UniProtKB/Swiss-Prot annotation:
SUPFAM superfamilies: Ribosomal protein S2
Alphabetical keyword list: Ribonucleoprotein, Ribosomal protein
PANTHER family found in the cross-reference section: 30S RIBOSOMAL PROTEIN S2 PROKARYOTIC AND ORGANELLAR (PTHR12534), SMALL RIBOSOMAL SUBUNIT PROTEIN US2M (PTHR12534:SF0)
InterPro entries: Ribosomal_uS2, Ribosomal_uS2_bac/mit/plastid, Ribosomal_uS2_CS, Ribosomal_uS2_flav_dom_sf
Entry similarity comment: Belongs to the universal ribosomal protein uS2 family.
Gene3D superfamilies noted in UniProt: Glucose-6-phosphate isomerase like protein, domain 1 (3.40.50.10490), Helix hairpin bin (1.10.287.610)
HAMAP family associated with the record: Ribosomal_uS2_B
Name of the protein in question: Small ribosomal subunit protein uS2
C-alpha cells in the first residue's frame, strides 16, 4: 500500500522537470520522456521512492531521532515551516547560515542571545529600558528569529535532513556530508542525485508538489513517533484501477506546466 498515489503526484505537478537544456545527466534514470522542451519525471519511480523515503524517515523517528527540514526557496518556505512544526521537528526556511551545523557551538550562542532577548521582554526588562534600546533589541530579535527560530529548540545535530532542492541548498548539503548526516531530498532534473542518500525525483518548483511531498515526510515522522497502531488511515492510499498511468501523463503535459523556466 503506497503512501502516495500516481494521481496525487500528477495533480500536484510533480512530474514536470526543468527545460531539457538545464538538466543533470545523472538524473536520466528518473526521467520518463521529454515533451515541448521539458523533461517529464517517471512517476512510477517517484511513487516507489516516496515509499522508501517515508520508511526511512519513520525509522529515524522510531529510534528517537531528530529531523531538520530545509527549504529556503520561496515555493518551499511555508510548507517547510508548517510541516516541520506539525511533526514536532525543526526547520530552516530562510537563508542557510554557513556553519549552522559545522559550527554548532557558535550558532548555539546566537540562539542563546535570541532566548535572552525574549526573556528580557517577558520579565519586564523592556519596560525600564529606553525606547531606542528596545527598538534595537527587537530588530536584533527579528533577524535572529528569522534565521534561527526554527532550530532554537533543536537539542542536537539532526539525525536526518530533509531538503527541498539540494542544488540551491548546496551549503547545507556540504555540511551534512561533513558530519555524516543522511539526506532525504526532493531532487529535480537539474540536481545531482549522487549527493543524496534517499532520492525523491520531483518537481521542486511547484508549491503544490513541495507541499505534498513535504507533508508525507512529516506524516512519516509523526507515525514513527506514535507507533504504527496509532497511525491514521489517511497516511496511506491505495491505487484504484482508474489511477493515472505514466503513459497518461504525456497526454496532459501540454497543459498546466509548473516547472521552473
Amino acid at each position: 500500500m503506497a503512501v502516495i498515489s500516481m494521481k496525487q503526484l500528477l495533480e500536484a505537478g510533480v512530474h514536470f522537470g526543468h527545460q531539457t537544456r538545464r538538466w543533470n545527466p545523472k538524473m536520466k534514470k528518473y526521467i520518463f520522456t521529454e515533451r515541448n522542451g521539458i523533461y517529464i519525471i517517471d512517476l512510477q519511480k517517484t511513487v516507489k521512492l516516496v515509499d522508501a523515503a517515508y520508511d526511512y524517515m519513520k525509522n529515524v523517528a522510531e529510534e528517537g531521532g531528530v529531523a531538520l527540514f530545509v527549504g529556503t526557496k520561496k515555493q518551499a518556505q511555508e510548507a517547510i515551516k508548517d510541516e516541520a512544526i506539525r511533526a514536532g521537528q525543526y526547520y530552516v526556511n530562510h537563508r542557510w547560515l554557513g556553519g549552522t551545523l559545522t559550527n554548532w557551538d557558535t550558532i548555539q550562542k546566537r540562539i542563546a542571545r535570541l532566548k535572552k532577548i525574549n526573556a528580557m521582554e517577558e520579565d519586564g526588562t523592556f519596560e525600564v529600558l529606553p525606547k531606542k534600546e528596545v527598538a534595537g533589541l527587537n530588530k536584533e530579535r527579528e533577524r535572529l528569529e528569522k534565521f534561527l527560530g526554527g532550530i532554537a529548540d533543536m537539542p542536537r545535530i539532526p539525525d536526518v535532513m530533509y531538503i527541498v532542492d539540494p542544488r540551491k541548498e548546496r551549503i547545507a548539503v556540504q555540511e551534512a556530508h561533513k558530519l555524516n548526516i543522511p539526506i532525504v531530498a526532493m531532487v529535480d532534473t537539474n540536481c545531482d542525485p549522487d549527493e543524496i542518500d534517499v532520492v525523491i525525483p520531483s518537481n521542486d518548483d511547484a508549491i503544490r508538489a513541495v507541499k505534498l511531498i513535504t507533508a508525507k515526510m512529516a506524516d512519516a515522522f509523526i507515525e514513527g513517533n506514535q507507533g504504527e497502531d496509532q497511525a491514521t488511515e489517511e497516511l496511506f492510499v491505495e491505487e484504484t484501477p482508474e489511477a493515472t498511468s505514466i503513459e497518461e501523463i504525456v497526454d496532459v503535459v501540454e497543459g498546466n506546466n509548473e516547472s521552473a523556466e
